[in-house]
Regions:
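Conserved H-loop
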Residues: 29
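Short beta-strand->loop micro-motif that forms the acidic, two-metal-ion catalytic signature
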Residues: 42-45
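Catalytic core of pol beta-like nucleotidyltransferases
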Residues: 1-23, 32-37, 47-105
């Protein structure tokens, strides 16, 4: 896969404008410097919403056409904090090793 940070930043800017998340974090192999030719772009979107699955589908649909495969994880701040409070390894790794691409001001 040909990962292009400029194209990703443009996609994040559109996502931020349209959905106004609190944060967007790049995680996984591209963030951790361990990508392989089949790696997708993993994004964690933090937004206070009543239905994270519905929002994930909306965001997913808005990101077409895609220059590379994207895998989305949408969480509310409460979900994120609850999982951090129980030392959830996956969420802790996203926070500790991920790259913050967007934060609401």
């Amino acid at each position: 896969m040909n990962f292009d940070m400029v194209k990703l930043q443009k996609a994040i800017a559109l996502l931020a404008q349209q959905f106004q998340p609190e944060k967007v974090i790049l995680f996984g192999s591209w963030a951790y410097g361990e990508p392989n030719p089949n790696s997708d772009v993993d994004l964690c979107v933090i937004k206070n919403t009543p239905n994270t699955r519905s929002l994930a589908r909306e965001i997913d649909s808005s990101l077409f056409p895609r220059p590379f495969p994207i895998d989305l994880l949408v969480m509310t701040p409460k979900q994120m904090n609850d999982r951090l409070a129980i030392n959830d390894y996956f969420v802790t790794e996203i926070i500790q090793k991920g790259k913050l691409l967007y934060a609401k001001r």
